[in-house]
Swiss-Prot record:
<keyword id="KW-0964">Secreted</keyword>
<keyword id="KW-0325">Glycoprotein</keyword>
<comment type="similarity">
    <text>Belongs to the spermadhesin family.</text>
</comment>
<feature type="domain" description="CUB">
    <location>
        <begin position="30"/>
        <end position="130"/>
    </location>
</feature>
<dbReference type="GO" id="GO:0007338">
    <property type="term" value="P:single fertilization"/>
</dbReference>
<dbReference type="InterPro" id="IPR035914">
    <property type="entry name" value="Sperma_CUB_dom_sf"/>
</dbReference>
<feature type="glycosylation site" description="N-linked (GlcNAc...) (complex) asparagine">
    <location>
        <position position="71"/>
    </location>
</feature>
<dbReference type="InterPro" id="IPR000124">
    <property type="entry name" value="Spermadhesin"/>
</dbReference>
<comment type="function">
    <text>Not yet identified, major porcine seminal plasma protein. Can bind soybean trypsin inhibitor after deglycosylation.</text>
</comment>
<feature type="disulfide bond">
    <location>
        <begin position="74"/>
        <end position="95"/>
    </location>
</feature>
<dbReference type="Pfam" id="PF00431">
    <property type="entry name" value="CUB"/>
</dbReference>
<dbReference type="InterPro" id="IPR000859">
    <property type="entry name" value="CUB_dom"/>
</dbReference>
<keyword id="KW-1015">Disulfide bond</keyword>
<comment type="subunit">
    <text>Monomer or heterodimer with PSP-II (depending on the type of glycosylation of PSP-I).</text>
</comment>
<feature type="disulfide bond">
    <location>
        <begin position="30"/>
        <end position="51"/>
    </location>
</feature>
<dbReference type="GO" id="GO:0005576">
    <property type="term" value="C:extracellular region"/>
</dbReference>
<keyword id="KW-0732">Signal</keyword>
Length: 133
């Protein structure tokens, strides 16, 4: 990784630390349109089995998305990241591990889906406007 590309990742990790320690906006609801410069989506524990969050920042900036906490039951639940609005190309479905995504876009969609009757497992999804645009 070149130094120029390492800077946004360092900013993401340092900002993720700030957000997870009380700086930032926390979302626990199932889905919605989020237009803040940064925030954290936490495990939704309600009755709905599918949640869709549309993330959008000013078009002159890019979004960085990090999934530092993801311990889902593979085969029964997943988080999917789309490169734009709902219905856009999928960047992947994730059920465990650490994932960091930067697609050069000002909008992304995050979808959480689980089987009916299966309890929600813990996840944390951090989004952040890239200050370097």
């Amino acid at each position: 990784m070149k130094l120029g590309s390492a800077i946004p990742w360092a900013l993401l990790f340092s900002t993720a630390t700030l957000i997870s320690t009380g700086w930032g906006l926390d979302y626990h609801a199932c889905g919605g349109r989020l237009t803040d410069d940064y925030g954290t989506i936490f495990t939704y524990k309600g009755p709905k089995t599918e949640c869709v969050w549309t993330l959008q920042v000013d078009p002159k900036y890019k979004l960085l998305v990090s999934i530092p906490t993801l311990n889902l039951t593979c085969g029964k639940e997943y988080v999917e990241i789309l490169e734009g609005a709902p219905g856009s190309k999928s960047l992947g479905k994730f059920c465990e591990g650490l994932s960091i995504l930067n697609r050069g876009s000002s909008g992304m969609t995050v979808k959480y889906k689980r089987d009916s009757g299966h309890p929600a497992s813990p996840y944390e999804i951090i989004f952040l406007r890239d200050s370097q645009g």
